Amino acid sequence: MILIKNVFVNGKRQDILIEGNKIKKIGEVKKEEIENAEIIDGKNKIAIPGLINTHTHIPMTLFRGVADDLPLMEWLNNYIWPMEAKLNEEIVYWGTLLGCIEMIRSGTTTFNDMYFFLEGIAKAVDESGMRAVLAYGMIDLFDEERRERELKNAEKYINYINSLNNSRIMPALGPHAPYTCSKELLMEVNNLAKKYNVPIHIHLNETLDEIKMVKEKTGMEPFIYLNSFGFFDDVRAIAAHCVHLTDEEIKIMKQKNINVSHNPISNLKLASGVAPIPKLLAEGINVTLGTDGCGSNNNLNLFEEIKVSAILHKGVNLNPTVVKAEEAFNFATKNGAKALNIKAGEIREGYLADIVLINLDKPYLYPKENIMSHLVYAFNGFVDDVIIDGNIVMRDGEILTVDEEKVYEKAEEMYEILRS
């Protein structure tokens, strides 16, 4: 049992009582309710829901700064994919731990990941105390033999993650994109998603080049093509990027309840474009936030994404009223929880105890009149305490689950292997 005393939460000073992995009570907590509770002093602190990053490639912390200032296809073909060919479980494990440290320190408690060597990722997630949805990244390049291997691996990893019996680690399916995956693979992904009741995590409409490739091959835009053979039917889908969209595609997204992972910083850095977020919001489409991998961002600080998502669309639409501060904050909290189907993203009784505490005695958080504005437009992301699944993962700036110095040392060692 954990008691956070006298913390600013949901607009006023209150106590938060945590029992097991859930929030038991918000309000005044009596002494008889907290026998043997660990007490955290919430004085001068605000409690916010843990942030939810809906599109990552976590081990790519080791690719940070490797290939900057390049277009997506050149970035992938000439730099990223050749380095990824050298990956193994150990490299992925240490890269993931490095990412978990970075996310915990910047208030992220849950992430939705697509990558390889999931045993290493799952081990790191388990040790760090984070919550994650993990998908094996599937690419068959329209080759039948490779397709069978990818589908076999995807199913193997779903069963592996389920066998861990860890409620913090959940499986998903991760077909990379329609320009790297065959129709046959994508159709089978839909079947597997229904069979195992897991979400689909996919890249869609990230660049004009990608859309052109799909149109040349199929005669249709990506969402229209996928919808033509029922890819979105009866499944929960998280579509990363969604930068260039036709009105017909947006109509499909609304009909099929597509969850969008908006990655504004990665899309800007790779010059992919700007997603039409105000248009998607007007249609009632669930918009969430992702950082993408560190190779294209180059960090995992979701507070930066919140700020950029709030200001970017004001600028490109010449309208200061679009994507208001609270709306942008919700992208990274309650909207992310909805996309991943977890009872989190809000500090409410009965919800998962994924809570972040921020010391308000910082110059950029004064005056204390409009804290939501400060969190979105002024905060740098350095949080003080992190609770995930009812466990204290970081206290007063010290991570309790991971040996940070060892991770930093091993990260350099793993990077040298990748660059050799």
Swiss-Prot record:
Q: EC number(s) of the enzyme?
A: 3.5.4.41, 3.5.4.31, 3.5.4.4, 3.5.4.28
Its recorded reaction(s) are: 5'-deoxyadenosine + H2O + H(+) = 5'-deoxyinosine + NH4(+); S-adenosyl-L-homocysteine + H2O + H(+) = S-inosyl-L-homocysteine + NH4(+); S-methyl-5'-thioadenosine + H2O + H(+) = S-methyl-5'-thioinosine + NH4(+); adenosine + H2O + H(+) = inosine + NH4(+)
Q: How does activity depend on pH?
A: Optimum pH is 9.0.
Q: Which domain of life is it from?
A: Archaea
Going by the UniProt record, its keywords in alphabetical order are: Hydrolase, Metal-binding, Zinc
Pathway per the UniProt entry:
Amino-acid biosynthesis; S-adenosyl-L-methionine biosynthesis
GO molecular function terms attached to this record:
5'-deoxyadenosine deaminase activity; 5'-methylthioadenosine deaminase activity; adenosine deaminase activity; metal ion binding; S-adenosylhomocysteine deaminase activity
Outcome (variant: Y136R): Lowers temperature stability by 10 degrees Celsius and decreases activity by 364-fold with 5'-deoxyadenosine as substrate
Metal-binding found in the keyword field: yes
The record gives the effect of mutating E150R as: Lowers temperature stability by 10 degrees Celsius and decreases activity by 571-fold with 5'-deoxyadenosine as substrate
Q: Where does substrate bind?
A: E84, H176, E206, D292
Q: How is the cofactor bound?
A: Binds 1 zinc ion per subunit.
NADP: present as a keyword of the record? no
Family that this chain belongs to: Belongs to the metallo-dependent hydrolases superfamily. MTA/SAH deaminase family.
> What does the annotation say about its assembly with partners?
Homotetramer.
Q: What is this protein called?
A: 5'-deoxyadenosine deaminase
